[in-house]
From Swiss-Prot:
This is Aspartate--ammonia ligase. It catalyses: L-aspartate + NH4(+) + ATP = L-asparagine + AMP + diphosphate + H(+). Signal peptide: none annotated. It is an enzyme of class 6 (ligase). Keywords: Amino-acid biosynthesis, Asparagine biosynthesis, ATP-binding, Cytoplasm, Ligase, Nucleotide-binding. One of its GO terms (molecular function) is ATP binding. Belongs to the class-II aminoacyl-tRNA synthetase family. AsnA subfamily.
Length: 330
């Protein structure tokens, strides 16, 4: 049992270390330290889809403030790029740990404990567009494939990803599969192509519903791009044979500028957020235009090592029935 446990841990570390090295080199970012707590009221917390409640923390020696365990570092990263004067084309990545206790299900792919490569870059002049988004997606996908090939060479786990990732807009997907749910659409398109970047998540589609929820103040999901489609964000999805379904590895996008922020908070009824310091800084032009996202570490390890449950590659909390169903949960 001990030998198996140690081997399991070595595999996890190999995937994480290999991916980190490739990501830093190919995406041209520097690894930095990030926070675990966010001060309530400064607008820095990531509100995700807008319904999740963060873990509240009171600090004894700072009695006049309340803090929250971060959901992600989406806003902190952009603030940090501005604070330290990062130039166009430069960026950072954080080994981010977070808690999301309001996950609506604890299952094979969802955990309270979140670990991800949280990255952000300053967009070069004139590149706040769909072409640059796709270029960045292709870079990250190359990192995923290089890591998969390294795992294949070391552990004899056959590589399965296609050489190229396929791009498709959510508007195209709902037209292609009008009778399917969003999740069923993801399964259908990802099974067909193996790896897909689904563009434009957050806005209302022609069927009257969004593909999925997104907070209004980090990704730009409303800007018109091409052929009447909207959104400069999306998800990297791969086909997972272990689960028999599409599997999200990353959510990312070009971040809101002043106009997109005002437009999106009005659409979601979150205009009160504009009173936060972070949002004021953005509206006053103090932040650079950026692109960023999160790449799930445990999800990446789970996929590349062909595990059936995320609890096999991370230590978290699970209902007893989940532990009873999977022998290898850590």
């Amino acid at each position: 049992m001990k030998k198996s446990f140690i081997h399991q841990q070595e595999e996890i570390s190999f995937v994480k270390n290999t991916f980190t090295q490739y990501l830093i080199a190919k995406l041209d970012v520097v690894e930095v330290q990030g926070p675990i707590l966010s001060r309530v009221g400064d607008g820095m917390q990531d509100n995700l889809s807008g319904t999740e409640n963060p873990v509240s923390v009171n600090v004894l020696k700072i009695p006049n403030a309340t803090f929250e365990v971060v959901h992600s570092l989406a806003k902190w990263k952009r603030h940090t790029l501005a604070r330290f004067g990062f130039n166009e084309g430069e960026g950072l990545v954080v080994n981010m740990k977070a808690l999301r206790p309001d996950e609506d299900s604890l299952d094979q792919t969802h955990s309270v404990y979140v670990d991800q490569w949280d990255w952000e870059k300053v967009i070069p002049d004139g590149k706040r567009n769909l072409a640059y988004l796709k270029e960045t997606v292709e870079t990250i996908y190359k990192v995923i494939r290089l890591t998969e090939l390294a795992v294949e060479a070391r552990y004899d786990i056959e590589a399965v990803l296609p050489k190229k990732i396929t791009f498709i807009h959510t508007e195209e997907l709902v037209a292609k599969y009008p009778d399917l749910t969003p999740k069923e659409r993801e399964n259908a398109i990802t099974k067909e192509f193996g790896a897909v970047f689904l563009i434009g998540i957050g806005g209302v589609l022609p069927d009257g519903k969004p593909h999925d929820g997104r907070a209004p103040d980090y990704d730009d999901w409303t800007t018109e791009t091409e052929n009447g489609y909207h959104g400069l964000n999306g998800d990297i999805l791969v086909w997972n044979d272990q689960l028999g379904s599409a599997f999200e590895l990353s959510s990312m996008g070009i971040r809101v500028d002043e106009e997109a922020l005002k437009r999106q908070v009005e659409m979601t009824g979150d205009q009160d957020r504009l009173a936060f310091d972070w949002h004021k800084s953005l509206l006053n032009g103090l932040f650079p235009l950026t692109i960023g996202g999160g790449i799930g570490q445990s999800r990446m390890v789970m996929f590349l090592l062909r595990k059936k449950h995320i609890g096999e590659v991370q230590t978290s909390v699970w209902p007893q029935e989940v532990r009873d169903s999977y022998d290898n949960i850590l």
